[in-house]
């Protein structure tokens, strides 16, 4: 094992199972957890709590740089703790998402949050969940995993999740939304979604989560 704090990055498209994998890896290894997908929502919520103007880079940058947030894997959920308070439910509100879109459009805020995310790297280690963790945020990470699955399989998983909540959804619509998002993510000008050159690419299309975890742990142990 290395004496410093190892970083394990897990990137991949929406619905591939990154969140579940990262939560289980953090629990098994006892590592810290970073959910980069939630970080802009967390900042937006902090701004709302403190009455900060969502359009003011000058006000948002110091808030982003000193963001007091923790991600804790508990059971099958990731708790998000902002300034000592569990804000997991608040993060899912539509108004939080809209506010997050505003702050994410500000270049200096993005740069400040990039530095803040890198500060999550601490003993005993870090599991970083995102889309550009291995390519942009932690390009020198010891372990990089790219978790993928076919668009059809991801749409099927999403449909089952929504049906369990009692929602009537159409497979074709979900598939179309996922394909459109994939296209945006893979072709955007800044930090397009792609595996790092030294990443292990895991295709979970025909794997269950236990099989994915076993392969990920084996790869991590071979690298550290």
UniProtKB/Swiss-Prot annotation:
GO terms for biological process: nucleobase-containing small molecule interconversion; pyrimidine nucleotide metabolic process. GO terms for cellular component: cytosol. It is an enzyme of class 2 (transferase). It is found in: Cytoplasm. Its main location: cytoplasm. GO terms for molecular function: ATP binding; CMP kinase activity; dCMP kinase activity. Gene3D superfamilies: P-loop containing nucleotide triphosphate hydrolases. InterPro entries: Cytidylate_kin, Cytidylate_kinase_dom, P-loop_NTPase. Transmembrane segments: none annotated. It catalyses: CMP + ATP = CDP + ADP; dCMP + ATP = dCDP + ADP. Its EC number is 2.7.4.25. CDD domains: CMPK (cd02020). PANTHER family: CYTIDYLATE KINASE (PTHR21299:SF2), CYTIDYLATE KINASE/PANTOATE-BETA-ALANINE LIGASE (PTHR21299). NCBIfam families: cmk. Belongs to the cytidylate kinase family. Type 1 subfamily. This is Cytidylate kinase. It comes from Aliivibrio fischeri (strain MJ11) (Vibrio fischeri). The gene is cmk.
């Amino acid at each position: 094992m290395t004496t410093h704090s190892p970083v394990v990055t897990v990137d991949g498209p929406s619905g591939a199972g990154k969140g579940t994998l990262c939560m289980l890896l953090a629990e098994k290894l006892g590592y810290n957890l970073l959910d980069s997908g939630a970080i802009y929502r967390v900042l937006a919520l902090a701004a709302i709590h403190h009455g900060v103007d969502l359009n003011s880079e000058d006000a948002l940058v110091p808030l982003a740089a000193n963001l007091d947030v923790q991600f804790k894997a508990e059971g099958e959920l990731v708790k998000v703790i902002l300034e000592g308070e569990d804000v997991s439910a608040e993060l899912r509100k539509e108004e939080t998402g809209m506010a997050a879109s505003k702050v994410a459009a500000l270049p200096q805020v993005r740069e400040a949050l990039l530095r803040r995310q890198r500060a999550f790297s601490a003993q005993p280690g870090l599991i970083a969940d995102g889309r550009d963790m291995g390519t942009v945020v932690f390009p020198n990470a010891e372990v990089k995993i790219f978790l993928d699955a076919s668009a059809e399989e991801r749409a099927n998983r999403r449909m089952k999740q929504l049906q369990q909540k009692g929602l009537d959804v159409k497979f074709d619509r979900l598939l179309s939304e996922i394909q459109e998002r994939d296209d945006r993510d893979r072709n955007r000008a800044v930090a397009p979604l792609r595996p790092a050159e030294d990443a292990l690419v895991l295709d979970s299309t025909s794997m269950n989560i236990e099989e994915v975890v076993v392969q990920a742990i084996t790869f991590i142990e071979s690298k550290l």
